[in-house]
Structure formats: C-alpha cells, structure tokens
Amino acid sequence: MKKKRDDSVSLSLKVTRIMKITLILILVGVIQVSATTYAQEHRISVSVKNGTFYDVVSQIERQSEFMFFYKSEEIDGNQRINLNAKNKLVSEILDEITKNNNLTYKVTGKHIIITKTAITSQITKEIVGVVTDERGEPIVGANVVEKGTSNGTITDLEGKFSLTVSEKSVLIVSYIGYNTQDVTVTSKTVYNIQLEEDSQALDEVVVVGYGTQKKVNLTGSVASVSSDEIKDRVQTDVLSSIQGTVPGVTIVSRPGKDVSINFRGRGNLGTSEPLYVIDGAIADATFFSNLDPNSIESISFLKDAASSAIYGSRAAYGVVLVTTKQGKDGRMEVSYSGMVGMKAPTYTQDLVNSWEYAELYNEALYNTNPSAGKNQGYSDEEINLFRNGTKPDLYPNTNWVDLLFDDWTATTKHSLNFSGGTKKLRYFAGLGYVYDTENIRNRDTRRYNLNLNVASDVTDWLTFRGSVKYIQRNKDVDGGTPSFDNILIVPSTFVARQSTGEWGSVESGHEASGTFVGGNPLRAYSTNDWSKNTIENSMYELGFDLKPLKDLVITGQGTYKSYEYKNKAYVSLKDDVPSFLNPGTVIGGTGNTTNSMEVNWKKHSFLTYTGMANYSLTKNIHSLSVLAGVSYEHYQEETLMASRQDFPADSFSDLSAGATSGALYQNGSSMQEYKMFSYFGRINYTLMDRYLFEANFRADASSRFYADNRWGYFPSFSMGWRISEEPFMKSMRHIIDNLKFRVSYGTLGNINNVGNYDYFQNYSGTGYYSFDDTSAKVIKESKPANPSLSWEKVALTDIGLDFDLWNGKLSGTADYYIKNTSDILLAYNVPLETGISNAPSQNVAKVRNRGFEFALTHRNTIGEVSYMVSANIATNNNEITDLSSSNDIINNLENGHGVAKYILREGESIGSFYGFESDGLYTQEEIDAGHYYTYGGVTPNAGDTKFVPQRELDWGEEITDSDRTIIGCEVPDFTY
C-alpha cells in the first residue's frame, strides 16, 4: 500500500509539472503573438529635417515601446535624412531609412535589431575624377572612399583620382576644412566633384569672459585647450595635464606644495596666480586642479588685458575659463575612460655604500692632516667588514632610499559619463575616481568627483540651468614623516634596526650619537604616528537665459561655493632607544615624553550673483554686440584649531581622549570676510568681417580698502585686421584661410595680495606693564592703519598675429607683450624705537615683464587616420624696475634653513637666488700656499668649496654675507 501511495503522488507531481510547462508555453505564445501584432499594427508619425539616423530612432523609441540594438560603427551618423512620415507603420519607416544605407533590420518582439547588409559579389568598374574647391582650384590630398568599405584613394597634385568601385556604390569625398560630400556612382565614369568650405573651421567658437566669440574675430590674446588634448594624459590633476600646451603659461610644481600656474612671468612680489572661472563661477586653483579632465569640454586662457579686463581686479595675472560638458538632445550616451598604471621617479639619489663612505671619510681626514696617516677614521679591517657584511649589527651597509622608497607605485583613474535628453530637457552627469600613491611608502591619495549639469527650455524664450560639482580628496599617511634631509645625511654606516628588533644604536661598530639615533629615518617612518587630511569642494549653480527680443539675451546666475579642510594628526609616544652595545641602558634624548594630537578645520563659503544683458545686431556689413552687467560677491571664512597631549594609548583616534588642563590643552579660532560689488561691460564692432574693434570696462568696489580708495576702474581697448579678407588677398585664398593682425592695451588691478583688514590699525595683546606692585597685560598697536592702501595696477600691451593655412592644415599664433605692474605692495622695515612689530604695506614697487610667444599646430587626415602635432615656445624677461629707494630685500627659501636665499633688487628678476659663487674645490697646494679665504672663522681644507669674493680681499681674509651675489633665478627665461 505504501508503494502504491508513492506512485500516485509521483503521478500527481508529473501531471502538475506538465500543466505548468503547458501554461508557460501558452503565455509565451500569447506574448509572441502580442509582440508580433504590435509590430505589424503600431503606427507613428516621424518628422525629421536634415537630421540623422539617430534622430529617427529617438523619435520611434519615444512614441512606441520598441528598443533598438545596433553597432555604432556600422551606422553613418553624418548622413543627413529628411523624412515626413505621418501615421505610418514602424516597418514602413524602417524601410525608408535603411534602404540607402546598406542596412537591414529584424523585429523580434519589441526589439528592433539593425545590422549591416551582407556584402555579396558585385560588378565593379573603374572611375576617374577631379576634386576642386569653390574657386575651381584642385584640392591635393582629398580622401575618396567607397562608402561602407576600406576601398579608397587620395587625389594627386592636380586634384585627380582613379578608383575601382562597385556599381551603384556611394563615394565619400572629404578634406579637412571642407564639408564632406556623398557622390552616388552612376553609369558615367568621369566625376567632377566640388567641395564647399566648412564654415565651422573658421567659425570655431572660443569661450571668453561672460560669453563666447568666433576665434577669427578675437582681438585679444586667447588660447584654448580642448578635452581631447588632456583627458588621456596620465597626470591625475588638470594643472599638470595642461603643462606645455599653451605658450606663456608655466606650471610650477614644488615638493609638498600645490601645483600653481603662471602667465607671462612673475608680476609682483607676492602671488601671481590667475583667476579661475568654472562655468561662469569664480573658483580657485585647488578646485580647478582637482576637476575630472573627462568632465571638461574646453579651457580658455585669457592672457592680455583686452580679453581679461572684463574681470577687473581679479584678472591682473590672466584668467583661466573652464567649460564643463553639457547634455545634448538625443538618447542617453554612456562613456567610460580608465587608466591603471605604474609610475617611477625619473631620478633618485644614488647614495654611496658604507665601505665607500668609510674610504671617502678617510681620504677627507688625510687631506686635512696628512701627517696622521691614511686610516684616521676607519681601519682596513673595518672597511672589509662593511664590504663583506659579516657583522651587520656593527658594520652595516644601509641604503635609506631603498628602505623607505618604492621603485614603482600604483596609480589609477576612472571616469564614467552619462549625457542625453530631449529638446526640452538636457542632462550631463560625470563621475570620477583617482587613486594615487607616493614613492615613500604608506602615503596615498584618493579623489572623488561628481559633475551634474541640467538645462531645461521652459519656452522658446526662457531656459533654466542648474549644476552641482563636488570634489573630495583624502590623503592618508600611515606612520611618521621622516626628514628627507636625514635620508641623505645619515650615513650608510649607521644601523637602521638591530638584529634584536630594537632600533639602530650602532654606527661603525660604536654606539651612535643621540642625534643619529633620534634622526633614524626608518624609525621616524615606522612609528604609530598618522595623519588624515580631507578637502571637500562643492559648487552649486542656478541660472536662467531670457530672450524677450530676438537679439537680446538677459542672463542671471547665482553660485554658492563651499570649501572645507580637515586635518587630524597624531604624534605617538616614543621611548628612548636601548643601547645594543651596552644592554640595560638607553641612549638619552632619543624619545619623546608625551604623545599629542592636533585637529585643524577651515571652511570658507563664497556667494556670487551675476546679472547681465547682451544685445547683438547684424546689418549689412556691420555687426555690433553690447554686453552690460553687475555682480556681487561675499566671502566668509572660519578656522578652528585644537590640540591635546597625554593620551592613554596610541589606539585613541579622538581628541577627547587627551588631557584637558594646562598647557596640555590648547585651542583657537578665527573669522574673516570680504565683499565686492562690480559693474562690467563690453562692446564688439565688426566692419565687413575684416575690421574688428573691442572695448571692455570694469569697475570694482572692495571692502578690503578704505572708503576713499574702494573703487577701481579697469578699461581695455583692442583692434584687429583680418588681412586675409581684403580683396588684394584673393589670389592667395587657396593657401591662406585666415591672417589676422591684432593689437591691444588695457589696465587691470590686483587684489590677491591685499588682506581683508590690511588698512585697519592692528593691536596685539602681548607683554606686561608693572603698575606699583601689580602686573597688567598690555594691548598695544602692532601695525598702524594705512587708509591710502590701494589696488596694484597692471598695464599690458600686446601685439599679435594669427594665421591658418592650407585649409586648416597649419595654424599658428605669435605675440609680443609688455606688462608693467605698478603700485605693488611692499612693507618697509620700521625702526625698533617705534614699538611697531609689523609695518603697513604701501603701494610703491614696480615690475616689468616682456616677452615673445609663438605656437604652431599641424592637423591632417590620411585615410581614416587623423592626427595633430603642436609645438610652442615663449620667452620672458622679468625685471624689478623700482623698489622706491628701499634696500635689497632678502628672504630665506621655503625650506627654512636660511642657507639659500631669495633677493629682491632693482634691475634684477623676481625669484633671484642670492648665494655664494663658487670656483671649484680647494687643492692641497692652494692651502699650503695660503691662497684661500676663510668662512665662518674656519680655515678651509683641501676639498672644501672655493667661494669667490665679490669685493677686494687679501688671501686669508674672511668671506661674509657681503660676498653673496645673484647665482640664478627660479623664473625661466623661456619655456617650450
């Protein structure tokens, strides 16, 4: 009975399974029938005028449930389609758009698959022809290709070609600077093909201040870089990526410092940073440098006063205009760009090994005192112990570079972009990620990018725009930061770590000094120290474009930019290092008695409002454009600092775990703000497309100045002459596409070196006075007020020539400029008797920059391969012309050692190095003959540097600071 019951259950399960399968098959059949019926009966209307295949597909998908699948390389996106299908079957529309494109389609359910028509054997024939331009001149090197194949040729010196093609095929004829033309092969065998000039080649639009202009109509010095030129570079920041792409623009990179940019030399005694503008909003170098290059559409560099005066007091040292990518009408496009790589330093210090060090040390001692013999420092036995490595605890061979640096480190960057939209709504979204490691171990940086742009055409005359940009950069350091000087100074004869696991305490078989032990680079690196640094940059924009009249556009934009910096650093407790040679004892002074943590936080916000109106009018041979606008800026900044010591253990990562009393607990804060209000305007006038005139004006009022000096006015004027458009150049138009001469002059202001409260009187609360038996804290004047403080001024003259030859194959620019900066802020030394610790800055110094710039670009297409080669060179002569009778100003280099110095001196360049000139090394013969100079009260030995005096000295007299001279300059004379 049990077996029968099991059989019945099994039979029941089989029946159930069969019923389920049958039901599924029925449902599938119904779905297929439904899909087929949908494909056969669904009607839509499609209207496309001078559109593309993609425009038709987009309309079908919007009006139906169909989804298209195809390979983009099989679709000719350039072919123009004119279609007006009303209430047509989808299949009828598909027949129409595929019949002349060598395409076929297949409907599967609600999926439409477009494929290339299989090529069958066809009858071929030979055709010949000539390709000319609109003036009948032959075009040399034009491409003639049979559509859909790799079969093609190029025209000869007379513009002629011959080609064997299939009957009823289509020829694609193209040449740079001309519109591509499709020619259908008919029964004839001779073809005369005339190409029309591509107006876009000369109508290239360049982003300028508060707008765009045709490149050929520019009268100022403007250079532009497209995303294609930088997006594939391996550098992880934008500033490094543009190095070498623009003449006169120099990228300055120093270890431990942010990368900076310099236009046409150093213009003053402080910072010469340009203004950064991203999608119309003012930004800074940090924001710009950390943008994702794959989200950038173009970068314009405004280098002269004519192009940058409209930004007034912020544009004294140029303007960098960034335009990010925007959405376009059409189906969503997804693009990805990624790079994973390894990097290595081009040069690392080649340190001598321990036995070489010992031999050189012996040689130096012998040169100092030959009578003491040749092994004054190390015996031959000790040198052999270094060499054979049999006693590494006593006679090591330590290579500090190998211990702390990696030969290769990883770097990677990824970008993912989405764009698309409809005629009413367009969007672009870009995501970016960068991971980069340093050559010193356990140092890494991560960067995250978001760029979102949305535009909506509410009506034909009103468009709203919005964008969000967000950047986060995290830099983590796991372990301490060894002194780079120690890596080079601590000799290879010092043990990094003993075999017992303790830190090195032996140098050349002897107990090392506390200085060596405390400066052990490996120990400094391997501690429980750590630091975490985070920078968050965000920008939010809302704007509109209103067109109340045909030629009038009113634009408004509001921007809020936020910057937040957070840094937390911990210094761990370190015990004194135990002695390896004297167990049970320690080497004093090699540890620290307490641990500590410090937190720094800084946030600033920048709010801007801009409103402007632009009116354009073209009538007959006249073209006029007028721009007028206002802007308002408000900057606010807050900082906080807190530190504590005496943490219970290294595992604590929060400040609250530290001590809360006395000197073990500190904090501080600051706040500041400024405001600016501005008027600006521009007039462009063009006569007969050959005579160009432009005038810019800006008036800025800044809270950084006293009321009487608050306003600054900055005009510029420029003119251009398109020589190529003159009638007498007609015979040269087959060679010269564009030849333009331009000249400009303008004045700009600089506010970057002015503090928010520099014109105020400053007080400090340091020091005490005694009144009878009572001590009272004193508040005293530390810096007098300076109500006359005003703008630094820049006057810039530029003469330039632009040319495009052979239909854009060769193009270039040449410029000569003179930039005079006056009223540069300079603080005089104040006598100590005044009791003033800080002198107020005054507008007194002057600097001049002069130079040439030249850039050349070659573009060409060979077959299906397009390429571009460019080169540029720029010279710059920088000179301090006036320090207002002030003495030379000498400053230490940023390393703080006070050895190498900068000097500011009239007639010399900013950034001049002030040091001792040397003439090789002293020989023993010179020392014996007394032909030497002392330095620091010390008589030199053979092998010491031979300093050259800059005044009359007798042998044996002392070299002093009076013998320093200019030995170089950090500002290059030319770049290329």
Outline where the language-model segments fall.
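Short, small/polar-rich motifs associated with maturation and membrane association
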Residues: 1-451, 458, 463-465, 512, ...
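Extracellular/periplasmic, surface-exposed regions of secreted and cell-surface proteins
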Residues: 230, 266, 273, 447, ...
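Well-ordered, non-transmembrane segments within structured domains
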Residues: 36-38, 130-134, 145, 155, ...
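Switch/connector loops and helix/strand junctions flanking conserved nucleotide-binding motifs
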Residues: 215-216, 310-312, 330-331, 345-347, ...
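Acidic, Ser/Thr-rich peripheral helices and adjacent loops at domain boundaries
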Residues: 486-487
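Outer-membrane beta-barrel biogenesis signature
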Residues: 497-510, 732
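Conserved small-residue
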Residues: 335-392, 641, 861-974
